[in-house]
Amino acid sequence: QNISAETIKAALTPNTKAIIVVHLAGMPAEMDDIMALAKEHNLWVIEDCAQAHGAKYKGKSVGSIGHVGAWSFCQDKIMTTGGEGGMVTTNDKELWSKMWSYKDHGKSYDAVYNR
């Protein structure tokens, strides 16, 4: 059974900053309710899509609904790199820019490609 807005709401504290939603066994969680709850409480939503490659929620690909999608390509996952690996996705340019810099010791995209 997937996480739900109801189970999340019961666990929220004043220290909660984000919700990590795991789409289990290719079955997306009820994202409309979760996103509404996150908006109400000003929380980030991170989708763990490691078990849901290609899955859709109401026509939208998982990993594109929350603020960030996280994809593990570890050797025991659906899609692998033959070892350790992964990917993050976002529709937010500011988040993308920050995440991009993490992969290269803090260098910005502009510093690498627009000098």
Predicted regions and their residues:
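Active-site region of PLP-dependent enzymes
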Residues: A52-K58, I65-R115
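Catalytic PLP-binding core of fold-type I/II PLP enzymes
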Residues: A5-I20, A25-G59, D92
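Substrate-binding/gating loop at the entrance of the active-site cleft, primarily
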Residues: Q1-E6, D76
